[in-house]
Amino acid sequence: MAHRTALYDAHLAAGGKMVDFGGWDMPINYGSQIEEHHAVRQNAGVFDVSHMTVVDIAGAGARDYLRQLLANDVDRIDPGRALYTGMLNDNGGVIDDLIVYKRDNDYRLVVNCATRETDLGWMEKHAGGFAVDIHERPELAMLAIQGPKARDILAGLLNGSRADAVKSLKVFAFAEDGDWMIARTGYTGEDGVEIMLPNADALTLWEQLLEAGVSPIGLGARDTLRLEAGLNLYGNDMDESITPWEANMGWTVMLNDREFIGRQPLLNQKENGHSEQVGLILEGKGVLRAHQKVLMPNGEEGEITSGTFSPTLGKSIALARLPAGATGKVDVEIRNKRQVAQVVKPPFVRNGNAVYKEQ
């Protein structure tokens, strides 16, 4: 039987169509995926992301442990700030991408549900020699409230320091109030926050948000929103065989004086060359989909890793992995026919506007 979040019955009550996602029963949509997508771009939407795995890392060795475990460096941020990073294997491949929240005396990680067992096993394996406690927090729910009006609406529903945090937090900063953690982060390319809170509090906040005009958003629109924002989906755009250099995650790699797992293979690959992730926009009709073949004018080939129809742009878009230096026009094989696509630098959309640049 699949896992269910504390909001499972609320999803059904809102008309949610439930599907299996990484072993969880989650809503794919509540009626119209397109309308949900536009609601987040134009107003505000709430996502139940309680299927994500929350892990607290404490102990005197937590800092040194995470500096070895992660490709990005937790020393780059102060308490109250968050950091996006990859957790790599010995070959530099991405075991998972995650967010680290740095507190005064410990850290919180949010990792993907589909990689939970692999992640926890890897983290435990490499904890030897460090004074650390790795503690999963299944009693916490997680809601993402996203969109241009999201923070204003949410602040009006909360009191005191929680409302202040929603109004004043800078991007990738967070604040804690009791058992709540409020972070100005997201996966949509819009402004908003993500809140970790006790399962017992989640339903009340969910109902308040819907009553205030915030739309419930399913996994379908979550995917089109993140793809417009040029954000990776683990298992599609990267996995253990793909390095950060090949997944447009090079900016998350800190090659400073510390040793971290996968560092040497990354140095070798950076010196020897590697494929690159780019954006594609289809010039004609049709839909770009994962695993479609991309053909470059010089005869080299690549592959689409994620593709969809962009409701905001009214065009089909994709992320693709191509040989280094790809620019201009390429051909994509769609149903055994070649169609022309333009190579662009993602993201495609931010804050409701087209922002991509042709390459």
From Swiss-Prot:
GO molecular function: aminomethyltransferase activity; transaminase activity
UniProt-recorded name of the protein: Aminomethyltransferase
Protein role: The glycine cleavage system catalyzes the degradation of glycine.
Entry's Gene Ontology BP terms: glycine decarboxylation via glycine cleavage system
Known catalytic reactions: N(6)-[(R)-S(8)-aminomethyldihydrolipoyl]-L-lysyl-[protein] + (6S)-5,6,7,8-tetrahydrofolate = N(6)-[(R)-dihydrolipoyl]-L-lysyl-[protein] + (6R)-5,10-methylene-5,6,7,8-tetrahydrofolate + NH4(+)
Gene field: gcvT
Sequence similarity: Belongs to the GcvT family.
InterPro entries associated with the record: GCS_T, GCS_T_bac, GCST_C, GCV_T_N, GcvT/YgfZ/DmdA, GcvT/YgfZ_C, TrmE/GcvT_dom1
Signal peptide start and end residues: none
Description of how the protein assembles with itself and partners: The glycine cleavage system is composed of four proteins: P, T, L and H.
Alphabetic keyword roster: Aminotransferase, Transferase
Gene3D superfamilies with a match to the protein in the record: Aminomethyltransferase beta-barrel domains (3.30.70.1400), Aminomethyltransferase fragment (4.10.1250.10), Probable tRNA modification gtpase trme, domain 1 (3.30.1360.120)
Native species: Alcanivorax borkumensis (strain ATCC 700651 / DSM 11573 / NCIMB 13689 / SK2)
E.C. designation(s): 2.1.2.10
Gene Ontology annotations for the cellular component aspect, listed alphabetically: cytosol; glycine cleavage complex
Pfam families the UniProt entry points to: GCV_T, GCV_T_C
